[in-house]
Every structure is written in C-alpha cells, then in structure tokens.
C-alpha cells in the first residue's frame, strides 16, 4: 500500500499537470468534433507521398494534402507492378484522379473499427485512384527514407529487416505474424527501449563526453524517428531515452517513473489522439509495469527473465483481452525462450547483416529456426477465452497490480474467472443477424449460453487469380465473426446449420470450425458439393436431428429440387412466444408449397429469402406470414441489385432491417421483452 501511495502522491505540480493533460485530451478528442477539408465529391487531389505499401496488385500510400489521405491504387499488369517502385518514391508530389470514399465503421459488434482508427489519425477519407502523375521530386530526408525502404524491400529477409529496422510488420506472412500474436510475443517485433539502446551503443562507445553524446544521439534518433514513421512505441522509447540522459547529465534526480510519465504527458500534449493508439497503450502499460516492479526484478539471469515475463504478461493482459478476447497462458514460458533469442541474437544480427550483406544467409538460417519454433509452439498454445471485460474490471485489475502483495494474484485470477462466468450469468435470449456482406450468417443464443446455434456462415467465391496479384495476408470473411463470438464468450456451437452449399452461405464454415468448437453440422438433402465434402471429411458429426431444450427448430423443406437454392433448409424456430423463419435462398415456388403444407401465420421475425431477390418473398407469402420484422442480409452496393424494390414493397407493412444499411442486428429477449440494436456502418 505504501508503494501505491508513493505513486499516487506526486508533488502538486505533477498532479496538476496530470489533471490538465486529462482535461486537454478529453477536450480535443471527445468534445471537439473534427471534419474533413474535402467535400468528398472531388475527383482529383494532389499531395506528397509519405509512406508506401505494396501488397499483391494493391498499392497503398499515405498522401499529405490539405489533410492526410489514404490512397489505394490497383495495379493493372505484372509489368506495371515490377516497375512501380522505381516510378513512385517517398516524398514525391503526385496528382491523382479518382474518387473519395468514407471509411466504414465496424458493423459487427466488438470488432476493429477502421473508421475510428483513421479518425484518431485525423484521416477522414480514402481515395481510390484510377490514375496518377508525378509532379515533383522528393527532398533529401525523403530520398534517404525512400532509398532505405527500397533497399530493404528488395532484400532477402525483407520481412524481418522491415520489422526490426523500420518497425513495419506488413511484409511478415500472415501465418508467422499470427503465431507471434497467439504465442503472446508480438511485442518483440515492436521497436522498444532495448532496440534504441542497441542502436546508439556505437555512438556511446565512440563519444565519451556525455553532452556531446546526447546531442549526437538525439539527432540520430530524431532522424530514425522520421524514418520509422513516428509510431507511438518508437516515440515513447526515444523520448524516454533522451529524457533519461538529460536527467543523468543535469543531475535532476527524477526517477524512471517520473521520466516515463513525463514522456506520456509530452506525447499526449503534442497529439492527444495518441491515447487511443494501441501501440501507445501497450508500450506505456508494459513499461509502467516494468519500472514499477523494477525492485523485484532481481536474481540470476533466468530469474530476472522469468519475473520480467510475468510482469509483462500481467500488465498487458487486460489490453490483450480487450483486443483479442483471449490470452495464451503459456506466453510467459514462450517469452523466456524468445526474449533472449530475439534481443541478444536475431535483432542485433539483423542489423549487422543489413550492413554486411554476405551474412544474410546466416540470418536466413536464424529466421528459419525462429519461424519454425514459433509456429510449432503455436500448436501447443493454452488459449483461454476472456469475453469483453467491463471497464470496472479493467480498472480493478490494474489497481490490484499496484498493490505489491503476492496474495493479490488470487484477486487477479478471480477477476478473470468472473469475466469467464459473466456470459453464464446472462439469462437473456439473443438472435444476431451478422453483417457478412453479400451472404448470410445468423446466431441463436439461449440463456446462460447453454445452447448456441449458427445458421450459415457467410463467405464469397474465391476466384483464381495470378500469383502477382495475391495478397500476403490470407483474409477470412469470418475473422470478424470469430472475434465477435469470442467477445460474447461463445466458444462452441451445438449446431452449425448450413442451409445450402453456396459460397455466400457456407464458405466460411471451415475457418469457423478451426477456431470455434462445432459439435454438430446440419446439411440439406441436396447434392453434396466440394465444400460440404470437406466438412464431412473433417470428422464432425453430421445430422438432421436436434436435441434442444431452449429452442424448437423444424426444417420445413425436406423435398429435393434441381435448384440448390430451393434445396435450402428452411428453419422454423420458436421459443417463448416468438416465431422466427429463416428462408435461406428458397424461391417463390418453395414458398407456395410451404403455404399449402404449414400454418405460417403471424411470424414475428422473417429472415428474407435470397437477400431480397425478386425470385423470393412473394406478395402472397408475405400476406400470409404477416411478419412484424423482416431482416434482409445483403451486401453494400452489390452487383445483383438486391434487395429488389418490388420485394421491399411486399414487406412494407413490416419493420425492415437491412445489413447493408443497419449493419448487424441484435434482438435481445428477456421475459418476453424485446430490445433491438443495430450496428450501422
């Protein structure tokens, strides 16, 4: 408790400055609302290129114009791709023709918001360029940065060179970076104080005068900051290093904690939006923990490493849980393996081999070992799901960490256990219609998560493309779905119902099965396609029978048609006093048959068939059902013209929700009381 008081009871100047910074950040980030200097309908723009990324056939760069803009340009030929980095340089002035696009917010709850991410960087638009023209060359600093970037990009081992030298992880393959993240060691790829100390080691050895050394290293580090693109973790590391040197030379006697907090104050004063930068949060939270517990990091090398890994793990846990909704309990041990390997061998050897290129073959060997061990250990990850932590839990977790008592670990574990139990203590029903673009994905959740059911998974057809167009990262449409599920504490499904085998309904099933425990899969009576064969061959139990307590589910369509859409499983779901009908992609022909065979009146929730196509949801069918709510799962600006205007007219007596306009839709039912929430883009 004394240590906690010591941290909280700064002198009045520090405390007042902290209060001022807090008010300052809130005022400039929450009260003032910023808007673009562009109208959004401009078709041309000019500015300076400040960063470049090339991935497959997509060239992206940051353009400094009236304001910062993200520019996307799609390369037309392989020859153009091979030459484009010799034509476009960092610092070039360019003239562009194309169109502005406003970034979309996250339409699936608890997932990454690209719109908020760009807003916090004061970027309000992306620009889709159709043509470009270089109208001015770059200056000296940008020439240095451009040459360094191009040299790294064309090197063998460019992925690690770019990560360790410029702090850019974009060239790392998705498999390798995912392994770093799952193993809890992705922080080793971020440039930190250790890297900064290593970079200036030579200068400190050559220049003995401390003031001259500070001057030279400060210039060098400021240049390095410019080269790396001024990211939060690098700014923190450099500022901390410089302030620590000043503190020593001027004999100011400030503690490392004072210097760290002063660094945070300074960064937030210059850019208050840094408070929402994930790199800033991770960097300061972990560094705070290390400085705060520095007295405990004692003993032999192994013990120091173990204690450091535990401190890093604990202080980063709430942030990691809020981002990924899971943590790897083995990351402490994995850090003990990788921290010395990367910090003492791989990182310094990467710098040396970049300067002495003939050593790159040895570096390749070290990288291969690193990647193989990393991927191998990923298979033994001990991942536990942590549903979205309430703010009060996060604050409590850190307050307990500030009280230096060994028995407090019990309270930290209790917080995690309670987080785990929160979904089990939820006695509501939920039905989610997730925004998966031009596809279908619905989720049923019973009280206490005792029964969870997924109806379709979403997806899209993978068209064969040339190798030069292929992106480095394998993107799955269901990655957002999986993150959402984990945020809600849903780690398994009793049933995954695939209404039919079309890609927009079933393509993401395998990726979901890889990440979420699916106990049973329900397939329709139609012919089994290649995707469905993969599902069956995975060894999962395939059934058409349900054993449920909270939901009553009937498949109303057991006939066999020539058209796969008409073979769709039509799910009639009832619970409490509510009736749900999920039509898959069934056409009006099947609808008429249903009306002849079943009493389908006063349906509360109609999942409209075939994304609102004109071949489904006939007037007669709607008049009979009299749906209260109609949900259309449809992609924004889709090429099919869905939903059809006639279908919207047919449904006009019901409340219509569309995923292209409303995003994901949640229906929460508690004691027959209905609450509706949408997540519009």
Predicted regions: what is each one?
Residues 288-387, 628-632:
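Alpha-helical transmembrane segments of multi-pass integral membrane proteins
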Residues 120-240, 245-246, 314, 494-495, ...:
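Aromatic-rich juxtamembrane segments at the membrane interface
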Residues 593-664:
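Cap/insert and terminal regions of metallo-dependent hydrolase folds
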Residues 491-504, 606-610:
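Metallo-beta-lactamase
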Residues 3-7, 18-187, 465-467, 476-483, ...:
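Membrane-interface helix/helix-cap signal primarily in integral membrane proteins
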Residues 2-8, 13-23, 127, 176-332, ...:
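Hydrophobic alpha-helical transmembrane segments in multi-pass membrane proteins
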Residues 272-275, 378-381, 385, 389-392, ...:
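Core dinuclear metal-dependent hydrolase active-site scaffold
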Residues 497, 503-537, 627:
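Active-site HxH/HxHxD metal-binding segment of metal-dependent hydrolases
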